[in-house]
Amino acid sequence: MKMKSWFALAVGLTTCVRTLTAAETAAATSTWTPLLDPNLSQWEIFIGVPDVSIPVPGYTHAANPKQDKPLGLTNDPLHVYTVRMVDGEPVLHISGEIFGGLTSLKSYDGFHLRVQFRWGINKFAPKLGKPRDNGILYRCFGAHGAVNHVWKHCLECQVQENDIGDLFSLGGIAEVACREYPGTGTNKLWRYTPGAPLRLFGGRCARGLDYHELPNGEWNTIEVMAVGDRSLHILNGHVVNVLQNAKKGVEAGKPTLVSGQIQIQSEGAECEYRRIEIQPLADFPAEYQGLFSATNASPSQP
């Protein structure tokens, strides 16, 4: 009887050891790297020009608004970007009071970025009366403040109420398979449409195929996959936009856009991010391979 008890105990201990070893092995082989911590140690903050309605101690606007200077790097007096701990994990709070960019210290080539995001309540000028707005900028290159005195040149995965995943080309360009659909006035609008001809976007917006945004206050999962000059925008598991042939500008001879930093915008709306993580990506998963056009057409620019 004692031998049976000892045997049962030994089996139990062995099972426990094997279970722990398997869990530890899985953790050790995980390629996801968390990018968010209480000190934002993997990021730097650049704050743009405050709206005249937002008082900032020590800041004076120029007589000519075009000559207003951004607050600049590591100068965030209103604490636009802060981190708080919620249930033991860091949550990035973006007040939206002033346009800004939270910029990764590292540049990335092939990557899979995954975040959870939700809207807050407050909105600020000049975005009052407009949809809440934010954005995940990637393939960022060049100087801080190159775009609107605040952001770097980049491709943008738009994060805006009811159209998360749109493409905005802020200095970078990319091609999207898309078709025209009715716009307002003389503006042409384009929507990503699988199998449609490729068109070049250099500053204009390529609307997503479909949106699966959860109600305000709920956490959405946003993913950006980028390999070489191609990328995907994914919202809550659904592909919203497919980009390819990205370059550093519309002029002939501009180099292919295959690496860069990541920026998270502040753009007039309160919001939160959590579980910001990234992993290397050598190629797109098999289920996404067929989404890209097999040809590099010479598209016209909308």
Give the role of each language-model region:
Residues 1-8:
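Bacterial N-terminal signal peptides that target proteins for export
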Residues 8-18:
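Bacterial N-terminal signal peptides
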Residues 23-302:
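Carbohydrate-interacting regions of secretory-pathway proteins
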